[in-house]
């Protein structure tokens, strides 16, 4: 009887929490963001989707936690929330715990994933990002989660555009950030806030939780992203505003979609995937397409074989294609893949 009574009290407390969360949707500003979020998920998921949600403690991810929880309550579906503790800063474990405790009060139960092992001294953000996605992918596979939600917003989209431009990215890299990505094991990575402004997400975090963590690296000019952020502010002052940037990205996307058609055709017609050996066999016609089609085709294959969220840098892929075209028999490793050319045939498998 006591157990039943406690269960009833627990359910009653949950209902009160859920009602309080949903009441925030009456706020016009919050409701506008939620409606965009809902539309995005409705278009990319079905009603039985199992969500994983990546949380950090910043305003973007806390807003994502709130919006996903509201969506889960309304649609009676399950959402799993994950915090990654990179242990790169002294206070990271304490911060992860405080975010977990805070969200638990709102019936958002988080699991903390810890990155163990040696920490990098260079390319810190890039290496941390790869480890973060690997941890998230593993837990999603373990829990049979089909969709992982990430809190990237439109400011991230602009920053990534310039970062990729500086690194010499091609059309694909400049226009594809923010699109759904299908990983191995059929995990789909979604960015449902990609058209939302950071200032709106800060507003939601303050209104709902009255809390968010400021990442000191965001203001540190040691990191490229921080310098890019300042560059965008300067460009806005010079007249290259966000509307013009949106138009540029949209035009690049139209051109990109046309090339994608030929990339899919190239992979289908000129390569074969042997699933049990996790190996691609590529014929000589694969490399006789236009440069951009070959580049993208090989990039897709490298990502599929390695299972890594991010592919190798563009220069490394271009160098690989050059070596394949210039040497008959060659063995190369790149991005977690083993590439071997025998006569006119190329084999790409997982690096052991």
Annotate each predicted stretch with a short phrase:
Residues 215-219, 242-245, 310-311:
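Short, surface-exposed loop/turn segments at secondary-structure junctions
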Residues 1-60, 78-82, 86, 115-120, ...:
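AMP-forming adenylation/ATP pyrophosphatase catalytic core
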Residues 7-231:
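Core alpha/beta nucleotide-donor-binding catalytic domains of modification enzymes
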């Amino acid at each position: 009887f006591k157990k039943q009574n406690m269960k009833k009290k627990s359910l009653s407390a949950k209902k009160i929490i859920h009602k309080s969360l949903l009441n925030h949707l009456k706020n016009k500003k919050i409701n506008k963001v939620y409606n965009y979020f809902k539309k995005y998920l409705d278009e990319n998921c079905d009603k039985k989707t199992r969500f994983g949600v990546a949380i950090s403690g910043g305003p973007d991810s806390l807003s994502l936690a709130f919006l996903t929880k509201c969506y889960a309550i309304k649609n009676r579906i399950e959402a799993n929330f994950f915090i990654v503790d990179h242990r790169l800063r002294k206070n990271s474990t304490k911060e992860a715990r405080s975010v977990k405790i805070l969200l638990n009060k709102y019936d958002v139960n988080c699991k903390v994933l810890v990155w163990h092992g040696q920490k990098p001294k260079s390319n810190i953000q890039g290496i941390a990002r790869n480890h973060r996605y690997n941890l998230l992918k593993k837990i999603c596979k373990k829990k049979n989660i089909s969709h992982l939600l990430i809190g990237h917003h439109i400011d991230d989209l602009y920053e990534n555009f310039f970062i990729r431009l500086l690194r010499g990215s091609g059309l694909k890299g400049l226009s594809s950030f923010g699109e759904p990505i299908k990983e191995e094991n059929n995990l789909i990575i979604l960015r449902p806030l990609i058209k939302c402004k950071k200032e709106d997400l800060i507003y939601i975090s303050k209104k709902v939780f009255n809390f968010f963590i400021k990442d000191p690296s965001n203001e540190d000019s040691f990191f490229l992203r921080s310098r890019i952020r300042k560059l965008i502010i300067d460009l806005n002052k010079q007249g290259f505003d966000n509307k013009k940037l949106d138009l540029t990205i949209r035009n690049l996307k139209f051109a990109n979609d046309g090339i994608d058609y030929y990339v899919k055709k190239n992979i289908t017609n000129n390569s074969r995937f042997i699933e049990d050996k996790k190996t691609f066999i590529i014929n000589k016609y694969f490399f006789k397409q236009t440069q951009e089609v070959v580049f993208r085709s090989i990039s897709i294959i490298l990502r599929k074989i390695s299972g890594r969220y991010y592919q190798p840098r563009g220069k490394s892929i271009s160098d690989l294609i050059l070596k394949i075209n210039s040497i008959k028999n060659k063995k190369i490793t790149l991005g977690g893949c083993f590439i071997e050319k025998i006569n006119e045939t190329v084999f790409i498998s997982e690096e052991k």
